[in-house]
Amino acid sequence: MKKSVSPVQSNNEMPIPDGMTVFNTEDVDTNKQHMFFGKPLGVQRYDKYKYPVFDKLTQQQLGYFWRPEEVSLQKDRSDYQTLTDQQKHIFTSNLKYQILLDSVQGRGPGMAFIPYVSLPELESAMLVWEFMEMIHSRSYTYIIKNVYSDPSDVFDKILDDDKIIARAESVTKAYNNLINAAQNWGTSNLYKEGHKETYTSSYELKELKRLLYRAIVNVNILEGIRFYVSFACSFAFGELKLMEGSAKIISLISRDESQHLTLTQQILKRWQEGDDPTMVDIANEERENVLDMFRNCVDEEKDWADYLFSGGSMIGLNAKLLHRYVEFIANRRLRALGFDPLYDVPLRNNPLPWTEHWLNSKGQQNAPQETEIESYVVGGIKQDVKKNSFAGFKL
């Protein structure tokens, strides 16, 4: 963060305020900064990066830009009228849960992470991340307005659902702990004291970074596990040729969430590799807590599956299968972070293999006149062509 300096340095220099600033006039080499809690950013420049992977993720997210209105839901409205009460319960409950998750993600990164980011490429990736989450929330509204005769029947009942509220507490706790602690730190003398090498200031900043670490892990779990029971249910309807437009939209959302999962994985990986020595210590100290976070999430998602299928199964899907699927997904996410699997499900034995083509939209081949093409990438040009790139080609 920025050192405390005199408000006015000279008649020819802009004042540099204490604390956070929207534009830092100090010359800062961002390649030498940690990802978080460094000096505030100044010029938004995207020509050199400490971690190019974050710029690649920005480009990928921008290339995948889409709008829900591109997908027709005309058939979904009539399909919904043919669903059984149990199927309607599954479809509507999952929509409510997805609305909760993306309402959190639609503002969470901007409130908790972006104010303390110290690298322009990471700031950029997170800004696009938050924007895409807004697209997701608008997508749920688009589905609800087209499928239900009265959208208020869904929206107004979200906060009345005890199962949803129970999810909200576990999803938002780590976010709220970080946001409140960071705000207190930023508005008190702790912000200035953080630049002094004293035990108190170092301890306070380390504990704040610990909350940041937990929040990033929490989001990794949210993006990587919490969506997947509802994803599987949406895709199951699509497999039955029901609610296909909604399934297509959820497939687009899942593609974006995969990018956001990768973003959190890359942040955690950089910490493990020593981006911030304090974070290396914190990562080692938090290993058992991370495992507990994964266990709690898996247990909650199993409970959610039980709730969804409390009235019976649907063709190709039931609560027991979803239990195994959640364990399978959790093992994969743990392995990506360098942890051993927690559950007795082989990493290559997907209990719901038919979900793969929905999660990997690039693998779908659709005739343009039949359905919306979702594998199209906007601005997908290769820009690293060198002088000798075509040396072996002849006309």
Name each region found by the language model.
Residues 2-395:
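Non-heme di-metal
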